């Protein structure tokens, strides 16, 4: 059984820890802060087997150097650091090119790890799928999606469509606790979505109790995330009201997604 644990970092980052059964060697996803990872490993008496990186932003990669140095000093071994080959990330020694390989095998992890190319937030962003656990970095959030810093709306829409096609039960381990903020926007554009309104109550209760709203699931996101359902009649009507100068008579999914993302950027 694969156990997944969150380490809180900075204001709202999650660093995910992957542990197979009772193995003492674990993997971490997007360790932006080495100190919180080392504290966790020490407290749990665990060792670090490797690092999985989704994209190059500093709050996801800032801990690589200190963690690799720690492992080298304490074990004499080089720590395996996986990440997208196309992004300039210092410390990656196991570069991944999704067009050449769509999976990898990790020591101490039973299931193969599927690699998904999900450009949009950054040009070379990748995601990792381990059994039914999706580690998607800053591509898909609960009730939202990442900003387009480097990619195009078309790339992000294709990436989100790829993730939305995964089974309903797929658990979504994104890298930030942005849920309540995203839900405010979702309720603004999708005013009569009963599933969304119910989830707002659930998520608000969780956060009031100091609990995470992550992981979400693909099934839930398809029901409540406006960026996965831009042609919903209510959402299209909201877009028309916001962008009065746009002719949306024959609008397709990409057009509506693009306008939604522009709206969210200034929300």
UniProtKB/Swiss-Prot annotation:
Catalysed reactions listed for this entry: an S-(2-hydroxyacyl)glutathione + H2O = a 2-hydroxy carboxylate + glutathione + H(+)
Keyword annotations: Hydrolase, Metal-binding, Zinc
Cofactor(s) demanded: Zn(2+)
Residues bound to Zn(2+) 1: 55, 57, 121, 138
Gene3D superfamilies referenced in this protein's UniProt entry, alphabetically: Ribonuclease Z/Hydroxyacylglutathione hydrolase-like
SUPFAM superfamilies according to UniProt: Metallo-hydrolase/oxidoreductase
Recorded GO MF terms: hydroxyacylglutathione hydrolase activity; metal ion binding
Subunit text: Monomer.
PANTHER family: HYDROXYACYLGLUTATHIONE HYDROLASE, HYDROXYACYLGLUTATHIONE HYDROLASE GLOB
Protein name: Hydroxyacylglutathione hydrolase
